[in-house]
Amino acid sequence: MTRRRCGSADYSYQAFSYQPIACSTSQKHRLTAQKEVLLSVDIILASASPRRQELLSLVVRTFRVVPSGFDESLVPVDLAPAQHVLYSACMKARDVAARFPDALVISADTIVVVDEAILGKPADAAEAARMLRMLSGRTHEVYTGVAVVRAEVERADVERTEVTFGPLSDEIIARYVASGEPMDKAGAYAIQGRAVVLIKSVCGCYPNVVGLPLHKLSCILSEFGI
């Protein structure tokens, strides 16, 4: 697998016609000046993830949670990782936006990629252990697609981060799996939880690995005047 230099990105996704957004200093100032706008906008997070809720609260003062009903198994299997998460994030946002057409809907989707294989959430403890053995002592990639939809306007972007695990013995893996933490996490680990001691290094956006790339999201929200 050809690995990009840390920090570089080159994504395109014709189906949703998105363009990566460069967040300038003036946009950041405008974001600060327009905080009061948040009070008049019905903002919905289309995710039940407690981690995404915690991260979004750092950017948005008030929002509500309406989990999307989009079936992630419907994502086309032939998509590259960046396109995979963009497709899923956009479909999640559209699902909720269709029910709340006046709201601003935020959604995200995260996957772990190693050896060109996409690792989602493990189905059971055995699969969690298998995933962790794949990650042991190696560098993998975490992709998160984030989408924002309001009325007929849709913006989306993707973030990529490299994470390197230290060597994991069978005992360490068994103990971590027994904690239950891997079971609802892409790639079978939570960087913000017990797995932090298993990780040797992170290259790129840390919140992206948790599940919501805050810089990308802030730049997208600025396009909506928020």
Describe each PLM feature range:
Residues 11-18:
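Aromatic (phenylalanine/tyrosine) cluster motif
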Residues 14, 27, 34-36:
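Charged/polar low-complexity intrinsically disordered segments
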Residues 20, 29:
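Cationic, low-complexity basic patches in intrinsically disordered or flexible, solvent-exposed regions
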Residues 35, 41-44, 79-226:
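Anionic-ligand binding patches
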Residues 38-61:
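N-terminal beta1-alpha1 ligand-phosphate binding loop
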Residues 62-79, 154-160:
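Short glycine-rich, Thr/Ser-proximal phosphate-binding strand/loop in the N-terminal lobe
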